[in-house]
Amino acid sequence: IFFPPNHDPAKSLAPGLILFHGGNWVGGSLAQFRIACAYFASRGMVCATANYRMLTKAEAKKLPPGKSRKRVCVTDAKSAIRWFKQQAKELGLDPERLVIGGGSAGAHISALATLNPVLNDPADPQDVAIRPVAFLWFNPAFSPDDANDPEIDVQRHLRADMPPTLVFFGDKDPWKKGWDAVHAKMRSMEINAVEWHIESGQDHGFFNNEPFQTTTLHAADRFFTRLGLLNGEPTALPTR
């Protein structure tokens, strides 16, 4: 968890950000979004980068009926978001101003965790709402194959009252076709609060490296400012 400078939970509540790393639902690391979290904490947000169970194929085959590798990831993301919101007072977090997102598989997980009302852990407090004030998706891994399982198919769970959404993609990314299909469905539903940035000549994960890490985070900064979550101009990113 990353806090703003001189943050005092007893005196003020800051907007929040929780990001889920990518890794094809089987790998990846919390380290992916540490720079992003450190940056937005420096700008005034309480930030967290969250993990989830990453099952091998062998482990996934042992899951009981009604569960799958991706379903488990979504359930874990719901638990992480609920925990973050439950700790709002101690963290100095405004639970009504929480941005949720991630990269690749993490973006897919973040979408389903908030849009799909099921796949909850029964041990979690179901009365803790997990609707975000905005989405932040870095090349979200939305697959046409997900149509085979309605519970993990983002298109099945889009809602007309979707929160403002910011999306980044490289035009050489093979996953962009999945986003294009989801975006077309959003347009057909007149979901217009979507801003997307397509980087020419870039492939999957381009945002992890400079100069694109800076340009994408600064674009997200300006997006948050337009939503009233931040003030001022973007600043320099922290060093690694």
Language-model region placement:
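Short beta-strand-to-loop junctions in surface cap/lid or active-site-entrance loops
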Residues: 1-12, 91, 154-159
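Short beta-strand element of the alpha/beta-hydrolase
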Residues: 11-23
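Short amphipathic alpha-helix adjacent to the substrate-entry channel of hydrolases
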Residues: 30-50
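Alpha/beta-hydrolase active-site loop
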Residues: 66-90, 218
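Primarily recognizes the serine-hydrolase "nucleophile elbow" in alpha/beta-hydrolase
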Residues: 79-160
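Acidic catalytic loop of the alpha/beta-hydrolase fold
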Residues: 144, 171-177
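Short beta-strand/loop motif that positions the catalytic acidic residue
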Residues: 161, 166-169
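C-terminal catalytic histidine-bearing segment of alpha/beta-hydrolase fold enzymes
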Residues: 180-183, 187-240
